[in-house]
From Swiss-Prot:
One Pfam family here: SAND
Region (Disordered): 360-384
Location in or out of the cell: Nucleus; Cytoplasm
Comp. bias regions, Polar residues: 375-384
Annotated coiled-coil segments of the chain: 311-357
Record's function text: Trans-acting factor that binds to glucocorticoid modulatory elements (GME) present in the TAT (tyrosine aminotransferase) promoter and increases sensitivity to low concentrations of glucocorticoids. Also binds to the transferrin receptor promoter.
Name of the protein described by the UniProt record: Glucocorticoid modulatory element-binding protein 1
Subunit structure: Homodimer, and heterodimer of GMEB1 and GMEB2. Interacts with the glucocorticoid receptor (NR3C1) and NCOA2/TIF2. May interact with HSP27 and CREB-binding protein (CBP). Interacts with TRIM63.
GO cellular component: cytoplasm; nucleoplasm; nucleus
GO molecular function: DNA-binding transcription activator activity, RNA polymerase II-specific; DNA-binding transcription factor activity; Hsp27 protein binding; identical protein binding; metal ion binding; RNA polymerase II cis-regulatory region sequence-specific DNA binding; sequence-specific double-stranded DNA binding
SAND domain mapped to chain residues: 72-156
Gene3D superfamilies noted in UniProt: SAND domain-like
Amino acid sequence: MANAEVSVPVGDVVVVPTEGNEGENPEDTKTQVILQLQPVQQGIYEAGSENSAAVVAVETHTIHKIEEGIDASSIEANEDMEIAYPITCGESKAVLLWKKFVCPGINVKCVKFNDQLISPKHFVHLAGKSTLKDWKRAIRLGGIMLRKMMDSGQIDFYQHDKVCSNTCRSTKFDLLISSARAPVPGQQTSVVQTPTSADGNITQIAISEESMEEAGLEWNSALTAAVTMATEEGIKKESEEISEDTLMFWKGIADVGLMEEVVCNIQKEIEELLRGVQQRLIHAPFQVTDAAVLNNVANTFGLMDTVKRVLDNRRKQVEHGEEQFLYTLADLERQLEEQKKQAQDPRLKSQTVQNVVLMPVSTPKPPKRPRLQRPASTTVLSPSPVQQPQFTVISPITITPVGQSFSMGNIPVATLSQGTSPVTVHTLPSGPQLFRYATVVSSAKSNSPDTVTIHPSSSLALLSSTSMQDGSTLGNMATMVSPVELVAMESGLTSAIQAVESTSEDGQTIIEIDPAPDPEADDPEGKAVILETELRTEEKVVANMEERQHQVHNVEIVVLED
């Protein structure tokens, strides 16, 4: 490698002997010189990069002669000079030694971190970025991802065109092969010369010196790590140009007629290569070498678009399947909610039924007894619920011995009584032509044989209980003839009651009461008899009674005694 001179101000270079070399010749002492170049201004040189760039040169060169007559302003850089790039990963900082950065680089110890030489993978792990799958994206050079700089050709593995493991997996394989390498001192085309200021003075170069065993490097905020190798136009020209020898070689093969055979052989080799990749995938996990082969073939023949189309189709299928899965999952969740609701409903129903069964059932109150309508001329009398009341005798009424008849005026009347044995008469509301009545007839045990007592039935209403002092009041209590319940018989007696309407010319009403002696009674004079009578009247008489409030007078009651 040709030597190149780097001009620095006098006195800025300090040579420090390393430990362990005290017994050797001072002229052969190795030192480490760190050159910290300031950012290169854009547009000063035609060959300058688009962005500001800086080169950090860590050199361990041998100074053969240090004499007083040698100008210290010029320092020879030989093959021992090493190029280093300041890199970062998260908050961690380190130096990438380019001459040790060989393909594939991931497990190669080429990073100096905390005075230790480690691999880029280990450096990413120590920086806490091990979750990132691509170590080239985790490591940054001047704030730019290392992968981006390698894809653009700004930096590449050391002697990548000679030493390649086919596992570098570069996305721009051909471009990297033909692109220029990192700047190496001694190569005139790749070394960035020290820029000068506008007034012609040399830009100051800060030089710091450290021993190889000392820890850490002093970082200057003015450092940048963007190192450009060539312009974009130069890269395109180099990638598109084909040498004359290559063209003549393939033309000669075609001229001699071997092109078909060569193409067939190339095709067979490629098929065997791809077939081997498929077979290895069946028997073993995917290897890095297989990935390198596929990547090189795809990039060489321009098949990356085909690979991308396959990936897009699979992505669409996966998205469609995911949508179907989400829809099915939502439907299952909905069915589960419905089943939960259905399982809860029987529980609620059973609980409700149980509560209803355990609830005390309240007996509905019996309906109130409807009030009976009566003529306005009558008076309402409330019977005593405790005991049967005794009523005053209504005159004129006569109770005669057997065979003698007596008469009652203004039937029905409220009460008939004589002495201590009252006679009670009750009425029912007007109904059809055929009336049925029932009551209990009893006779109080007394010394008088003429005493008759009529007690009211439970289904009858008492019309009047007015106490009568003379017979003149009877005419004022005349009421409409209603269905009459008239009972006046003792057990063992025969009574005949004839009711005659004196004012009616069409007919008369006859009420017959037949005796029904109680077969179980020991004393026929002290037992009650339940009688049923039917009152039959002529149609015309009953019709007249319903249409008008007609009065019946002069009813004769005949009591026959056996």
